[in-house]
Amino acid sequence: TQRLANFLIHSSNNFGAIFSPPN
């Protein structure tokens, strides 16, 4: 389940990056 957790974290980070672009 560790791999799945890492995948979810990575997806969450990408999701945040898409809607919160750097200034």
UniProtKB/Swiss-Prot annotation:
Assigned keywords, A-Z: Amyloid, Hormone, Secreted
Major location category of this protein: secreted
Annotated organism of origin: Lepus europaeus (European hare)
Domains: entry comment: The mature protein is largely unstructured in the absence of a cognate ligand.
Keyword Secreted among record annotations: yes
GO terms of molecular function: hormone activity; receptor ligand activity
A single cellular component GO annotation: extracellular region
Protein name: Islet amyloid polypeptide
Subunit structure: Can form homodimers. Interacts with IDE and INS. Interaction with INS inhibits homodimerization and fibril formation.
Keyword Cell division set for record: no
Biological processes per GO annotation: amylin receptor signaling pathway
Function: Amylin/IAPP is a glucoregulatory peptide hormone that plays an important role in the regulation of energy homeostasis. Selectively inhibits insulin-stimulated glucose utilization and glycogen deposition in muscle, while not affecting adipocyte glucose metabolism. IAPP function is mediated by the CALCR-RAMPs (AMYRs) receptor complexes. Amylin can also bind CALCR receptor in the absence of RAMPs, although it is more selective for AMYRs.
Domain of life: Eukaryota
Family assignment from sequence similarity: Belongs to the calcitonin family.
Protein's cellular compartments: Secreted
